[in-house]
Amino acid sequence: MTRLSPQAIALWLLIAGNLTASLSDVMVKLLDGSVSPFQYIFIRQLISVAVIYPLWRKETRVTRQLRSPGLNVFRAHLVLIGSGCMVVAITHMTLASANAVFYAAPLLMLPISVLLMGEKPSRSKVLGTLLGFVGVLIVLRPSQFHWAAFFALGTATTLALFNVSARKLPEQQSMISTLFWTSLLSLPVAGILTVWSWQPINASQLGLIAAGALLILVYNGLAVLAYRKAPAGEIGLAEYSGLVFVTLFGIWWFNEIPDWITAMGIMLIIAPLLPIRRRFRQRIVNS
């Protein structure tokens, strides 16, 4: 009988999460800047709280409790900053180019995981992420650099911090509780920022925001599960799988066909991911 190791399970959870995150990016792209980033974030987080609340209420009193409030507040505002940067980047860049910068997050996760978690990544992990970073540079092509890439880098940084900090969450705080508190604690600041930029929205825009909220909620949940099962340095490269998804979605939905240079950069970004499945799979034979 074949059984996946905890690292392999975490890897697949993260790949599935990146599929949902990629679809969430498509929802933002379809909005095409018609809704301000602050308004988008506030409505998305409000919907997230409404969806999670019934599930949170079913949790036991122990798992519902807010633990490590400072850490949860920190993570909630990472979501705000990263989401705002993401909306700007996706609106002004192609899906593939914006996400190529987003997926610099695993490169940032290596030093962060070393500093915050005391993890010791292998030489192959370091070389793999450096190879991925070379791919990012090829996709961006400094001669054609877009100012929105700075916002994409902001998203990558907050994503790296968000994922690594999940390892410090108390075990007594369930995934549902973590998602609930992260969404709820982000609302006050998001609401204040939204007041300055509020404008009427139609049903179509609200539907896209709601879909994006649900999809990113699934990603956050899967990411929490994944990074609790394995060290960030061991599975962070799986974040690159989302770049494959957004490239395909960009071609399908928006006719954003990458040229050969961009395609080469994307291949360099995802190449380090290819051997992970084989390396982390365990075969256990039960008599």
Where are each of the predicted segments found?
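Helix-helix packing/entry segments at the starts of transmembrane helices
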Residues: N99-A104, L169-T182, N220-I251
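Membrane-interface interhelical linkers
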Residues: M1-L19, V49-F74, R123, L184-A211, ...
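Transmembrane alpha-helical segments that form core, pore/gating elements
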Residues: V26-K29, P37-F38, I52, Q144-I201, ...
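Structural signature of hydrophobic alpha-helical transmembrane segments
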Residues: S36-S48, V88-A105, F145-T158, N202-I216, ...
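Cytoplasmic-side transmembrane-helix entry/capping segments in multi-pass membrane proteins
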Residues: L11-L14, L66-H77, P121-F133, A149-G154, ...
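C-terminal transmembrane-helix exit sites in multi-pass transporters
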Residues: V88, A105-L127, V244-A263
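C-terminal-most transmembrane helix of multi-pass membrane proteins
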Residues: P142, V244-S287
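Hydrophobic alpha-helical transmembrane segments of multi-pass membrane transport proteins
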Residues: A16-L23, M27, V73-T91, G154-S165, ...
